[in-house]
Structures are given as C-alpha cells and as structure tokens.
Amino acid sequence: MQYTSGSTRNPAGVMITNEALVTDVLQINEALRFEAPMRIPTWLPQHHDMGVIVAILGVVLGQVLEIMSPRDFLQNPKRWVDKLSRRGDDPADVHIYTCIPNFALDLAARYAAPETPDQYDFSAVDCIIIGSESVTKPGVEAFVGAFGDSGLDRTVLRPSYGLAETTLLVSTDRTEDRPKFVEFDREALAQGKAVPAEDGVPMASNGQPVKWMHFAIVDTETKNELPEGEIGEIWVNGNNVAAGYLDRPEETEATFRNTIGTTLQDGLPKDNWCATGDLGTVLDDHLYITGRVKDLVVVAGRNHYPQDIEATAMEASDHVRKDSVAAFAVPGDDVERLIILAERADDATEEGDAAAEDAIRSAITTNHGISPEVVEFRAPGGVARSTAGKIARRVNAKQFTEREHAAAE
C-alpha cells in the first residue's frame, strides 16, 4: 500500500501489486543503467513513493543505502552534499546515485556551497534524479553554479516524471543535452498549445517514457490522443500501473479504468488506461509537464498555470521565500478570484509586505493579464504542504475559503 502525497487532495491508498513493483524497478534499472561499484545516499522519506522505490532498488541491486532523515537534510543540507563527494575509501570507479525533489537544489546551493572548489569532489556523481515537483531552471542553475567547479557534470541532473499510481517512474531524460529547458509562449499555453518562443515560460523536459508501458497525451473531453505540441492529460497503460485505490471504487474507476478514443500511435490498447491528472505535451520526443488538470486557474475563460504564476511572484521580490508560494482560484460573484499566499524570506519582516505585494501584483498583471484579489504573506512554514514537501494548492484553497466563511459569520 502506497499513499499519494496529498498535494492535491487527502492522501489515497494506492494498491501496488507485486507485478507493478517489479516492473517499475526493472524500468528504472533499464532507464538509468546503474553501474557498480556504487553508493546511494538518500534523505527521502520512506513513506513517500520516491523514498520507497529507492529503498527497494537498494535491495534489488544488493547495495547498502546511506540513509538520513529528511529532517537531517533540512536542518543542514551539507550533510547530504558531503555524501555526494568522493571519499578516500571510495573505489576509483565508484558511481554515486541519488534522487531529490526540486527544492533541494536551491537549499543545497544556498547552504552547502563550497568555500573553495576543492572542498568537494563530485566527479563520481553519475545521476541525480529530480522529481516529485516541477523542475525549475533557477533551481538547476543555482545548483550547477554552486558545484560546477567541484567536478559536477551538468548532465547528471535528470528531471523525471512519475506518480504513485504508476508505482513511480513514467519518464526520464536519456538524451545527451540534459537537463533541457524550452521556453513556451504564454498565450499559446493558455490555448492548449506548446509553441517555443523567446522570453516565454521555461519548462524542463522530463525526457522520454520508460520501456514496457504505453503512454499518450489525451484530450480530456473527447478522450482522443492528441498530436505533438498540443496539451492534454497524460495517460499511462502498463504492468507498472497500480490496481486501484483502497476502498475508493468510484475514484478507482475514474482513474484506472479509462478507455481511449481515436489514437495516433499504432498498437495502443483500448482499455484500462490510468488518467494521471497531469497536463503535458510531447515536443521533439521530450515530455513537458504543464500542470494539474484540477489546479488550472481559470479567470474570465482563460487558463493560467499556477506554477507559472507562482514563479512570477517569486521573481518579483526578494521578500518572497523560494519555492514557497501557492497560487489558486476560489469562487467569486461573477468570475473566479486569484489568491496568492507567499512565505516571507528568512530575513524578511512584516514591514516589507506592502512593497512586496505591490511588486507581485504588478508582475502578475503585466505577465499574465490578471490581477490577484488577495496577496497574503505568511511566516516561513505558513503555506500548507504535502507529506512530500510539495505546495498543496487545494489544501491552501480549502483553508482560505473556510477562513473567509468563518469571518463572514
């Protein structure tokens, strides 16, 4: 039994079969091509799918994992960074593998950057899988900037996509130019198209689907497969897909028992597709994740991706703590209202809220053509997150709405 992270709803128990578990581990092994001797340092929580699969991989590969708790990492990111560095007792041909969410890149760069280039030796790092949340260009650049002179090869960073419903991995970048970022036209994105453009919205490639499964981008209304460059829901079909949700028959039917319509690929099965709830597109054999179906901010009939708005808010002011913004919509009298919740940076005070709010409003209006009804600042840790550390937009929206209703009574 593997529970979802709870970033979009209450955690659901996902029933992982032995077949799904073995299939996923084989898919990961084939995609990453592990080489011995190796070390696998990890701080991922063992109750989260990434942490569980890393632990099982250690068993399958016959490796002893170097485990620390998430608290150990968060209190001092250097503890994890130290383990990525080549040690005196490492074999000359050692390979180091690890797996992290995106926010760890910035934390490591900020709090564990070397004082001198020779403080670390990252030459043995073979792969850093980045998943669980959207991979951001600033996070990648900060990490490479901090550790590039210490022997870090940029191509070891591998943005990847997966979810509990498929046991874990769905895609990872296996090209030589990873990590790959493409900027997409914001207006086209709002219309369901992915069109590369200068000064657009940067998105990370999550690579190519793993072997031994079927994969399609599907129109959420017609259920037909969409061509390259069009945005739709990501559907997956294969032995890595879970059996369903525990004691949730209706949700199981809606998520795991889907029938695809017209297809463009040859040989696709008709039934038992898993609708992931994630929106994305494929362009030049690269998968790009654009958002969640249920997280879309729809104002005046236009689609806006919350992570895009959140990125704008973070870049608008140094008053905002990195990766600590929630953008969501709540019902209004005529149209939905855009709400922004942001945590203050560690060194920020309430006195700077007003100026930062003005900067955020101006940036969002300029870049997205909408104006937030509420911009609210909170202390660090004040924005709700899932058990995996991801911003829980729907939880924040529910709490915000409940608070408004309570205040009105």
Show which residues each predicted segment covers.
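Conserved AMP-binding/adenylation subdomain of ANL enzymes
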Residues: 22-39, 46-96, 111-114
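Motif- and composition-driven signal specific to adenylation
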Residues: 15-19, 30, 36-38, 42-44, ...
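Gly/Ser/Thr-rich phosphate-binding loop
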Residues: 92-98, 109-200, 214, 222-223
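AMP-binding/adenylate-forming catalytic core of the ANL superfamily
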Residues: 85, 238, 243-244, 254, ...
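Conserved C-terminal "lid"/linker of ANL adenylate-forming enzymes
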Residues: 323-328, 339-340, 361-409
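Hydrophobic alpha-helical scaffolding
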Residues: 14, 18, 44-45, 70-73, ...
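Conserved ATP-binding/catalytic segment of the ANL
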Residues: 204-214, 220-229, 233-299
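Conserved AMP-binding A3 loop
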Residues: 1-23
